[in-house]
């Protein structure tokens, strides 16, 4: 996808994580050929009670035993610069993530709805 290749030119590392089991991840990868090249990290094995990271980040949804759909943009100093968290039934927007990353990387004040590469304030 264009968003995936754009990330590679952004001096950024894109990782994905999941509390899904291996069977779910294989099915997801088969359904999304364009996203197979993204590095994927298994953050927690909910079957074994390994929840510390997703609990610390505040994205564990106990009724489902899974992490909510979250995106974190973290700078090189490990400071979270941007967070979005959605319920399990709402997907995320790769284009919006790239737009926010682009704005953060300008180091300047950016207007709402600024497009990637657009002018700063």
Task: Write out the residue ranges for each language-model feature.
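Chalcogenol-based redox active-site neighborhoods
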Residues: 1-121
């Amino acid at each position: 996808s264009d968003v995936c290749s754009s990330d590679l030119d952004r001096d950024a590392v894109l990782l994905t994580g999941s509390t899904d089991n291996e069977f779910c991840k294989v099915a997801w990868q088969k359904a999304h050929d364009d996203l197979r090249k993204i590095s994927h990290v298994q953050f927690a094995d909910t079957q074994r009670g390994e929840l510390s990271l997703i609990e610390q980040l505040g994205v564990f949804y106990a009724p489902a035993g899974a992490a909510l759909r979250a995106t974190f943009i973290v700078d090189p100093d490990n400071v979270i610069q941007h967070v979005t968290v959605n319920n399990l039934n709402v997907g995320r927007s790769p284009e919006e993530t790239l737009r926010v990353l682009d704005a953060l990387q300008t180091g300047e004040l950016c207007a709402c709805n600024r497009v990637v590469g657009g002018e700063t304030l």
